[in-house]
């Protein structure tokens, strides 16, 4: 049985059509960049500090921490859903380092923050925070796992979101052609947009876990790739603030030899 275009995205049956101007816009390559910007709009940072508990102690996670985590994840060049783990890891690293500096700095050596904590202390804090529901909630709020229908639905029904994603790309008239009421059915010309959004989002990362016979080899490979991406990210960082630009990656040092 031959499938029509409206049946070619899993879980979506599109039968409605668009106006000719909307079809023309949706069929243009301009939509690739617009979808990219639409996805980036979901990658947010805290507007103000949020208090969580670290090792049983109240601790403030700052907007700067989430900003640096976002910069690291974006610079990895990974699809949005795969880059979420990098955002998570970097945010935990930021929290651990700041907390260690707060409670583990020798007053006689203030230029060496966290000196009083051992490597084991750092490892325990990192593991606890990676599994912390409060940290996971921050990750979900600022770098959620997304689906293609979410991206396209919000893009085409939220004027402000569409205007921001298409800034300098589409005219006001073009925006008007694309906008539709919330809960409108997907149209046949939406299917290529859904495909593009799915491509840019990528698959969600696998949960980190060990099998009965030991560590999951595939997960180890993915973690190693994530580590390389993080190192490369520091070399090609889309700097979120000036402090990020001071990072010297081990990748750079290795590459220089």
Predicted regions mapped to residue ranges:
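Phosphate-binding glycine-rich loops and adjacent basic patches that engage nucleotide phosphates
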Residues: 2, 51-55, 154-161
């Amino acid at each position: 049985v031959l499938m029509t275009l409206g049946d070619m995205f899993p879980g979506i049956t599109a039968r409605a059509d668009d106006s000719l101007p909307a079809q023309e816009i949706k069929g243009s390559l301009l939509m690739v960049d617009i979808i990219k910007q639409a996805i980036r709009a979901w990658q947010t940072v805290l507007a103000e500090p949020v208090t969580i508990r670290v090792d049983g102690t109240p601790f403030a996670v700052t907007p700067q921490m989430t900003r640096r985590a976002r910069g690291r994840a974006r610079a990895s060049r990974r699809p949005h859903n795969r880059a979420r783990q990098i955002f998570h890891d970097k945010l935990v690293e930021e929290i651990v380092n700041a907390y260690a500096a707060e409670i583990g700095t020798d007053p006689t050596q203030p230029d060496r923050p966290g000196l009083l904590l051992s490597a084991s202390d750092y490892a325990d804090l990192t593991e606890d925070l990676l599994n912390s529901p409060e940290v996971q909630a921050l990750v979900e709020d600022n770098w959620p796992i997304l689906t293609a229908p979410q991206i396209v639905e919000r893009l085409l029904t939220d004027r402000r979101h569409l205007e921001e994603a298409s800034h300098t790309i589409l005219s006001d008239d073009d925006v008007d052609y694309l906008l539709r009421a919330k809960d409108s059915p997907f149209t046949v010309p939406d299917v290529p947009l859904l495909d593009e959004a799915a491509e840019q989002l990528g698959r969600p990362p696998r949960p980190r876990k060990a099998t009965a016979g030991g560590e999951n080899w595939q997960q180890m490979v993915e973690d190693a790739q994530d580590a390389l991406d993080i190192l490369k990210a520091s070399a090609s960082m889309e700097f979120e603030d000036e402090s990020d630009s001071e990072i010297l990656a081990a990748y750079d040092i290795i590459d220089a030899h």
